[in-house]
């Protein structure tokens, strides 16, 4: 028997969608958690996002002649559109953790993994909205493909975008350069940007990594066992955490962007 390994869940007006990574299907439920149907696709789905009443899919290489990075489907699994075809000459270094979707209220941005061009949808048309420029550290996408390189090698000379997050009027991007994780914060109103590190002022030495962005709130979390083991002083200093057990739910940190 194969048990579902749900790696993502998303929702829209039509219900809740769970991505079963191992069996490569999307389980559709209504808001009473009544099962509706399984959605199957002829390609390998690794990330999903709901846009209004539709589902955006990000896929891995499938080796077929028709191989696109993104697909737009309706809630029944019918493909409505395809975006950004893959080059068959791409290398194999493609599966490294990074997100490809970010959404906040009515704003939606997507980008192929490690790509410096960020897109949005106008109706169902993919439209470039931002291009990242790391100056002399920008990967030369027009001359070669990043999947032919080991970007985790310390000798890799370029900066590679990892995750993207929309937070009200800000676009937050993280990248790794010479084994150090950096953040790039762009104010979409003033068009000003800042580069550097972001520290977690709630727990000293705890890494900062947004998990969810909603309105002007940036949400991070840590599992209870790790908090107890690695940051016992936090548990001792906060009365609300005194009865914390290793099996308890994760602890959330909620930040308000200024």
PLM ranges: what are they?
Residues 4, 43-44, 66, 95-97, ...:
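Beta-rich catalytic cores
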Residues 29-34, 73-77, 121-125, 186-191, ...:
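Short loop/turn segments that connect beta-strands within beta-propeller blades
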Residues 10, 14-20, 53-64, 99-120, ...:
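Short beta-strand elements that form the blades of beta-propeller/WD-repeat-like
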Residues 130, 155-159, 236-258:
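Sequence/structural signature of beta-propeller modules
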Residues 1-8:
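Short, small-residue-biased leader/transition segments that mark boundaries at the very start
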Residues 23-27, 64-72, 114-121, 177-185, ...:
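Structural motif
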Residues 67-122:
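Loop-centered beta-sheet repeat module
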Residues 89, 129-159, 188-216, 222, ...:
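Conserved blade-ending motifs and adjacent loop-strand segments that build the rim/top face
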